[in-house]
Structures are given as C-alpha cells and as structure tokens.
Design a protein with these regions (language model features):
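Short, hydrophobic/amphipathic alpha-helical patches that form generic packing surfaces
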Residues: 155-163, 282-295
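Hydrophobic (often cysteine-bearing) scaffold residues that line and stabilize catalytic clefts
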Residues: 19-23, 149, 153, 157, ...
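PAPS-dependent sulfotransferase catalytic core
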Residues: 218-273
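N-terminus-centric sequence/structural signature that marks the extreme N-terminus
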Residues: 5-13, 35, 130-136, 248-259, ...
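N-terminal glutamine amidotransferase
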Residues: 24-28, 84, 101, 225, ...
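ATP-dependent adenylate-handling active sites, centered on carboxylate activation for C-N bond formation
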Residues: 1-133, 171-217, 273, 277, ...
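Short amphipathic alpha-helical segments and their helix-coil junctions
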Residues: 133-148, 194, 258-276, 296
Length: 296
C-alpha cells in the first residue's frame, strides 16, 4: 500500500489529501481493462443537492432558535459521550460538526463542515501569528443568492467540485489511460436546474429531483436506495497497513521540513492513537504531505 500511495502522490504533482483518490485509482485501473472511456456521476450532489451538509445548512436556523441552555447541554453533555469512529461510522463526527458549526456565522459554519483543519489548527500547525485565510468562507459570503441552499451549492460548484472531485477523478483516471465523461455537468443541465426554486430542487428529499427523473429509467430499488458515500476504510488503513509508515515518517524532522509545528502535529497523532475522535483525514493529509516531500 505504501508504494501505491507514493504512485498516487506523484500522479497529482502536489499534496492532495482526499483518500477517495485511492479508490478512484483502483476503479479506473479495473475499468481500463475493458473500456477506454467511462461515464461518471460527478456533479450529481452539487447540482441536485445530495450532500447531507445541505440538510444541515437548511435546519441550522431552526437549531439556533432552540434555547441557549439546551444547545449548551448538547455541546457540553451529549457530544463528549458520542464515541467517534474512523472505521466507517461517521454520524457521531457529523453531529459534533453540526452542533459546533451551528454556533458560528453561516459562512464559517459551512467552511467548518468541508475543511479538514479548523483555522485554529492551521494557525498552530503553521505557527502563524494571525488566523489563516478561509477561502470557502469568502466564496459563501460572496455567492449571488440569499437562499441557504443556493449559497451552499454555488460555493461547492466553485470549490469542492473542481478542487476536489474533478481533480482526483482526472488525475487518477488519466493515470490509467481512462477518459471520463461527466454528463451531469453538462452546462445546459447545470444552468437549467440552477434556475429552479430551491423548494423544487429538494422536494421529496435531497436529490429528489434527480430521483424523480430517474424513475422512468431505473428500477425502484436503485432510485430509492439511500445515499452511500464512496469512502475507503481510512481509519483501518492508518492503524494497520499504514501504521508503520506513520510512525517512521511523521516525525519532528519531517514535519519541520514541511514547515509544520511538531507539538501541533503530535496533538493530532495523540488523538488518533486514543481513538476518541475521528481525525483520520487529518492524519492522512499529514502523511500525504510527507510523502509528497519525499517523492518529489
């Protein structure tokens, strides 16, 4: 797995922290054995409002109207007893992120849901005197709409989609000589759906519009199936096959060479070892950064 990780890092030419790239690489390799062009569903969640965080953004206002004492109970009493897991059960982490984020202004709330590291963590890791810039927050504030769903989708179409999904899809597919076609990102479709009222887009639930259209083409068992994320068992990897690599390569010397503050890194590694909070994505990002430095 370590060799495959290094190959993936070289394919990007820059530190890229989304571990789903690993799966896309394997899938592209298998697909290329049979075809040279494949269709992918990238853009479906951004265009048709499929992410769970969109639901969170829509109910945040209702949550904020709860009495302050009740929200404090949720944050101070309930959150500590929710055991997070990096082995595939993400709902405790998502509840914590929602409760913490809902106390922030909307732009900072949304940024906190899509970032690996909080501004405070980045400030400690980089040893900065002032908090770092938050591009997601800026995009959210400057979105040309006032409806929360519009703003979230527009923010993702300008950030999460091109800088994340399209980036790893292109890098990993082309690495294996596979060309991807993305019909859900046809500009005519994106523009048409974007002109619909938010209430129409989410009628029937997240991605409800796409599901209704698909009923004419697909069996009900596919149309009604709950959303399944395309995520690897990252926590298990980090505590099994990749554990020696973490131990040997994420060190005071390598992190100093990367410009990171070792006590801040050690704090993340300690959380990872204790297993109380799901910090697998943060550890993965640190490992990818180290491998990028070592292989380029």
């Amino acid at each position: 797995m370590a060799d495959t990780l290094d190959d993936m890092v070289r394919a990007f030419g820059e530190p890229f922290g989304n571990p789903t790239a690993f799966l896309i690489g394997d899938l592209s390799q298998k697909a290329r054995e049979h075809v040279s062009v494949a269709i992918a569903g990238d853009g479906g969640d951004e265009v048709f409002a499929g992410y769970p965080r969109y639901r969170g953004g829509l109910i945040a206002g209702t949550y904020r109207r709860l009495p302050g004492w009740l929200r404090r109970v949720a944050a101070e009493r309930v959150m500590p007893i929710l055991k997070e897991s990096s082995a595939g059960h993400h709902w405790p982490r998502r509840i914590r992120e929602f409760v913490n984020g809902a106390e922030l202004p909307d732009d900072q709330m949304y940024a906190s849901w899509v970032e690996y590291f909080s501004p405070d963590e980045r400030q400690r890791l980089l040893g900065l005197e002032n908090p770092p810039l938050r591009p997601i927050s800026t995009l959210y504030r400057t979105a040309p709409s006032s409806h929360p769903l519009d703003v979230m989708q527009q923010t993702d179409l300008l950030s999460f989609l091109p800088g994340n999904l399209l980036a790893y899809g292109d890098a990993m597919s082309m690495r294996h000589g596979l060309e991807l076609r993305l019909p859900l990102l046809d500009h005519r479709l994106v523009e048409t759906v974007g002109r619909l009222a938010p209430e129409v887009r989410i009628a029937g639930g997240m991605k409800g519009l796409l599901r209704r259209a698909a009923r004419k083409l697909l069996p009900d068992r596919l149309v009604t199936r709950t959303k399944r994320g395309f995520n690897p068992p990252l926590g298990l990897w980090l505590k099994s096959e990749l554990a020696p690599l973490i131990r040997d390569r994420i060190t005071p010397a390598t992190m100093a060479a990367a410009g990171l503050d070792w006590p801040a890194v050690a704090r993340i590694l300690e959380e990872h070892e204790r297993g109380r909070r799901d910090v697998a994505l943060k550890v993965w990002a640190l490992l990818v950064l180290e491998r990028w430095q070592a292989t380029t």
